[in-house]
Amino acid sequence: MSRMNWPRVATAGVLVVAGVMGSIVASQRTASAMATSANALLKSLDPEGRKKLALPLDSSDRTRWNFVPTSMFPRQGLPLKEMTEPQRKLAHELLRSALSDRGYTTTTAIMNELEAILRDTEAAAREASGRGSAGGQVRDPELYFFTVFGTPGEKAAWGWRVEGHHVSLHFTVANGTSVAAAPSFWGSNPAEVREGPRKGFRALDKEQDAGRAVVMALDEAQRKTAIYTETAPNDIITMTAVTTDPLTPEGLTYSAMNPKQRELLMALIDVYVSQMTADIAAERMAAIKKAGVEKLTFAWAGPVEPGARHYYRVQGPTFLIEFDNTQNNGNHIHSVWRDFANDFGRDLLREHLAAVAH
């Protein structure tokens, strides 16, 4: 190697090291914020509340998850309903430690506004039908359960989740520097509020619009490839599986798209990635690019017209996004982010335990 190339190589090396160190520092920042918030919430509770909130890291309940109402799926953990107002604020600080501003706004809109709208809408429908306003599913904005698994700390492996109807977010932390944030589920019923003071409100508007933008940007031949079936599935395909393998390759590849279409596909992925803190989002996007964007696929099921029942998914070597809007006559969304290696921090915990063993 000539002397004149040394500075260039040295500079590249510095940039690589800086990038790695920046990622570690960023992850450490999020992990530290999570631990601080979780410990503050734990400290605020009496023994009975702490017993509900805190479970061992190896609890079988850590990977038991769902997105249906609690009346259909009894949950462990401490619900907002049983917290004092100061404790609720601490629980929300924990939620904020993991999410971007948009992610927090989306999540709390589902928890608060949509549950209340659904409760009132269903009660009015029952009363109009002569069944009375009582009965049906319990729709309660305070029935969202927080659970901490293990002991939050700088060197510890631990995790936490928040879950209730249409929200199921899972986080695993190891060594105080690494965070896995999957699976992540958000739902919206209705997808669009059709009446009342909040008419027109859509909690998951970006997820819906960005997906449609991709399929509508395709030419006729590309669309025939992307739409792998004319009938959308009744729900997300992976449902509440603990682990998820890549689904059968369907749809149009990134390589078969033009530059504008590729830009729209990456923008769609970013909608999901950017629900998390900037640190987590940057790591997710870096992992996607490292695995090869040319391996990404976009698949659509059902009609493309607005209001029709439809489904789409984006899949890469490391992750899967599913979006389904088929229930309630095409006005009820389920969406999920799955990580093939790190749902519930599977690989993260394996690496942590291997390091501790040595």
Residue ranges of each PLM-predicted region?
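A cross-kingdom marker for long, charged
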Residues: 24-358
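Bacterial N-terminal signal peptides that target proteins for export
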Residues: 2-13
